[in-house]
Amino acid sequence: MPHSDELDAGNVLAVENLNIAFMQDQQKIAAVRNLSFSLQRGETLAIVGESGSGKSVTALALMRLLEQAGGLVQCDKMLLQRRSREVIELSEQSAAQMRHVRGADMAMIFQEPMTSLNPVFTVGEQIAESIRLHQNASREEAMVEAKRMLDQVRIPEAQTILSRYPHQLSGGMRQRVMIAMALSCRPAVLIADEPTTALDVTIQAQILQLIKVLQKEMSMGVIFITHDMGVVAEIADRVLVMYQGEAVETGTVEQIFHAPQHPYTRALLAAVPQLGAMKGLDYPRRFPLISLEHPAKQEPPIEQKTVVDGEPVLRVRNLVTRFPLRSGLLNRVTREVHAVEKVSFDLWPGETLSLVGESGSGKSTTGRALLRLVESQGGEIIFNGQRIDTLSPGKLQALRRDIQFIFQDPYASLDPRQTIGDSIIEPLCVHGLLPGKDAAARVAWLLERVGLLPEHAWRYPHEFSGGQRQRICIARALALNPKVIIADEAVSALDVSIRGQIINLLLDLQRDFGIAYLFISHDMAVVERISHRVAVMYLGQIVEIGPRRAVFENPQHPYTRKLLAAVPVAEPSRQRPQRVLLSDDLPSNIHLRGEEVAAVLLQCVGPGHYVAQPQSEYAFMRR
């Protein structure tokens, strides 16, 4: 039923008095209360707030995806202007009608790409399906358009990626596939739920610009859900701040950043990590914690030395990891992905070494290879003087008690059939460390340390927000008191307050127990805050490594400078200058089988600071 006379001129979406609740233990728990907002054509509305504040469930309610999950949604008005200019009341649409609205008129980019993509279909089939459904295109036309969309989101070897499955792509590449799928039908409204969380800063900058270009081209309204205030400053026209299910402040991006009125908004802004805040400091520094009573009370920097002199706890030499690509009638291996190429580094007890680089640079593969989650084709991995890359599976399991992994995708790494208490207890049971009663107490302590409640132990993963699920994964990794923790984008899904709490927790544990961290991240501001040393990876190789202060304050390699220049600044008046990003040529790390790539040769430019020699920078900055 049309409602064209009820939607104000210029608006493409209007929501009035939205209330969302869930039933728990026969009680109605409110998730969103009395939320009202509108969205104009060509406008970007950023919805910000802490994990569990109601941001994502608001988006799911607009897409009518909460009913199947048991959500109770009530709304006085939820109007959408379709691409055809017809105005509809979303709450009145049948399930069949909503299938035509989703994708064509209103699309959503979800936070966790691995759980949003179908594992049994190729990337090309999934993008083409939406194009064929909403644009009446043939299969051939849809695949051509799918390839064009992958090119637009700057995926290298786009034609090859079309035939890949989601598990064969990195987290950042999967997110780019999701973005390509959402934008393929040119919707009237795009809802982006943390769309750049899994992306490195350079790809994030390119995706933000791509969304801006398509938004201008199609007069598309964008609802941008994020916890990254730097992204908000760069892309938003208006900002809606949510706290505990309610809108506490709304205004233009300049008003929110320069004259915030609500104490929570002021605390949120003050807690944002700023690149360059560590200038002149040698050691990691704690984050300020969000407090409504004392907004952004800064804790003193950690100046004690946590790195222990002596032998490294982990030593990696010339690590090589490659993945085969099959083709042809006989399905033979003809090419290989050179994911990691002759990588070497040491990790000392009590040290945090951060691996940074673009999506597909080999950061995550390096971390997984250290635990033999992927097999390496060369090199040595030595832990506490023992070579572990040749250990039998039985001996390797005992070793994993001392080396724990925090994965990038929290939902995919938790068993949906287990309560989170059982998931945290499981490693304790596998290694026979604690009896049942003591294990339960340990779980309660761990949940409290990561900002959750002991009673949460009886809930299941789907009952938590993305940020809460990541905290659960961190609690599980800490259960065994490991000597080394490999954290793969461990805090990228967390809002600034919880991220600060988790980083502070990791620093406390490092100080108390001498834990060494291999911190894999694309968030340069967090890396600057937590790291003792930083290694920059590009196309599977380390091109710069050194003390954090030297790498950030005096970057030598052009790629390192490029990464730092791409970091969004949480200041609307200091947006990055417009750059041509959409037609850049992205080099590929796929080579013919048997083809060898010249090794990067590092030269010393300062105490502990090494940079790739110019002759080995083979077209690093072609773009």
UniProtKB/Swiss-Prot annotation:
Q: What is its main location?
A: membrane
Q: Reaction(s) catalyzed by this protein?
A: glutathione(out) + ATP + H2O = glutathione(in) + ADP + phosphate + H(+)
A Pfam family matched by this chain, by name?
Answer: oligo_HPY
Q: Where does ATP bind?
A: 49-56, 357-364
EC number per UniProt: 7.4.2.10
Q: Does the keyword Nucleotide-binding apply?
A: yes
User: Its topology with respect to the membrane?
Assistant: Peripheral membrane protein
* Gene Ontology MF term list: ATP binding; ATP hydrolysis activity
Q: Which GO terms describe its biological process?
A: peptide transport; transmembrane transport
ABC transporter domain residues: 15-269, 314-564
Keywords for this protein? ATP-binding, Cell inner membrane, Cell membrane, Hydrolase, Membrane, Nucleotide-binding, Repeat, Translocase, Transport
State its role: Part of the ABC transporter complex GsiABCD involved in glutathione import. Responsible for energy coupling to the transport system.
Q: Which NCBIfam families does the record cross-reference, listed alphabetically?
A: PRK10261.1, PRK10419.1, PRK11308.1
Q: How does it assemble?
A: The complex is composed of two ATP-binding proteins (GsiA), two transmembrane proteins (GsiC and GsiD) and a solute-binding protein (GsiB).
Family the entry assigns: Belongs to the ABC transporter superfamily. Glutathione importer (TC 3.A.1.5.11) family.
The molecule here is called Glutathione import ATP-binding protein GsiA
Q: What is the protein's species of origin? A: Shigella boydii serotype 4 (strain Sb227)
